[in-house]
Amino acid sequence: MIIMNLQIFAHKKGMGSSKNGRDSESKRLGTKSADGQFVLAGNILVRQRGTKIHPGKNVGRGSDDTLFSKIDGIVRYERFGKTKKKASVYPLEVEELVAE
């Protein structure tokens, strides 16, 4: 009886790990308050990178270009110039407060 010492190799190359399968976490950018919506002072209006929307009346701009309301009021998104947009917050009128 003959005893053979065999080592068997794979006849196809093994599959390595994929180079895909990763993604960065979303930053949740965009408008957080709609046009005509009532907001409180300090509420975030828009989260953005760069000044896609510029701050208007009663709106501040954070260090990461986030727009926020400086007063309680109604949000208005307006155009100025040919291509630019701005967000403003206007205080409620006395008649509007009584009607509600």
Swiss-Prot record:
Where are the annotated segments for Disordered? 13-32
Q: Which controlled-vocabulary keywords does the entry list?
A: Ribonucleoprotein, Ribosomal protein
Briefly state the modifications made to the protein after translation.
The N-terminus is cleaved by ribosomal processing cysteine protease Prp.
GO terms under biological process: translation
Q: Which InterPro entries match?
A: Ribosomal_bL27 (IPR001684), Ribosomal_bL27_CS (IPR018261)
Question: In terms of domain of life, where is this protein from?
Answer: Bacteria
Which residue numbers fall in the propeptide? 1-9
Instruction: List the PANTHER family.
Output: LARGE RIBOSOMAL SUBUNIT PROTEIN BL27M (PTHR15893:SF0), RIBOSOMAL PROTEIN L27 (PTHR15893)
Protein family: Belongs to the bacterial ribosomal protein bL27 family.
Output this protein's name.
Answer: Large ribosomal subunit protein bL27
- According to its UniProt entry, this protein's organism is Clostridium kluyveri (strain ATCC 8527 / DSM 555 / NBRC 12016 / NCIMB 10680 / K1)
User: Which gene holds the coding sequence for this protein?
Assistant: rpmA
